[in-house]
Amino acid sequence: MAGGIGSRFWPISRADQPKQFLDFSIQGRSFLRRTYDRMKVVIPEENILVVSLERYRDQVRAHLPELPEKNLLLEPYNRNTAPCIAFATYAILQRDPEAVTVVTPSDHAIARHDVFNKTLLEALAYASGSNALITLGVVPTRADSNFGYIQMAGKAEDGRPVKIKTFTEKPDADLAHVFVETKEFLWNSGIFVWRADAIRQALEKYAPEITNLWAGWPEALGTDGQQAFVDRIYTDMPRISIDYAVMEKTDNAWVYPAEFRWADIGNWESLYEYLAYHDERGNALNRTARRLLVDSSDNIVYSTRDDKLMAIRGLEDFIVIDTEDVLMICPRDEQKLKDFLSRLAMPEYEEYR
């Protein structure tokens, strides 16, 4: 899934170049490129599909030049994950009615790839013999209120998923701490494994407002009229996540506990943990930025330029972002930042979105 806007990472992530096409690390590969490279170790490349927006066609092609044209599915509008997954599911079913699929966001950071690959292969093997709707749940290493949590209904056993008891979307810090202490909760990774026909049946049962629009898909997908068909039905497509549309309604939701290192790089706080370099005072920095920091601590300092010095004195818990056309300086407080970024919707800032 590579169609998000990444608005919480403004001004680095913009509508015309969202975060899946950016490289926040020092590896020279975008999130999309790294996700594709990670998945092709487990999934044959001819079976990897990318769902993105029509406006990002050229960027996807630039980052993944080897991707077959038929494996690039283009939505006219972003309608969240449930419509995106429905689109991919119908396209996969047309090619292989018995397919077992993995659904993954394109903008997550994953380490310990050997553990990730083992977990994915085990989940695929289990899903192939059942109708279970499986999500990978990451064993939490800290109480983090930026992630969603999944409560297990029972004790985890090696090689088998556990029934899901509850979902909690981004609890406050105190509740997140309680969750981690109980050892009943996992981070919701947003990575899913299931048979294509199983998720189709679940979507038809719990989200008919999506699947009813897809009437006629067998005749439309894979033809010259595919894009026109998709563009037409998306004018009425609801905006809803797969968790709300299906996973929180079904009694067939399972979680596979996993211990690979994972992070949803969804906001500046998560990027603070992810950035490659932290100085002795807790400032998170990208290595290419030229900076002079004095009496400053626990800041996020990021620059897209290497020809400009960032001189900072006396700042604590701030975000300082410097790009070609925008300089942003604001406290790290997430709620204040959210309110601040919401003002970008005003017409006078349109050229900077």
Residue positions per predicted region:
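Short beta-strand segments
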Residues: 1-2, 51, 102-105, 135-139, ...
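Conserved N-terminal catalytic core of the sugar/cofactor nucleotidyltransferase
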Residues: 8-15, 26-105, 109-117, 121, ...
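Residue-level signal for inorganic ion chemistry
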Residues: 32, 88, 107, 150, ...
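Residues that recognize and position ribonucleotide moieties
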Residues: 102, 192, 264
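Conserved core of the sugar-phosphate nucleotidyltransferase
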Residues: 113-234, 254, 331
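Left-handed beta-helix
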Residues: 196-353
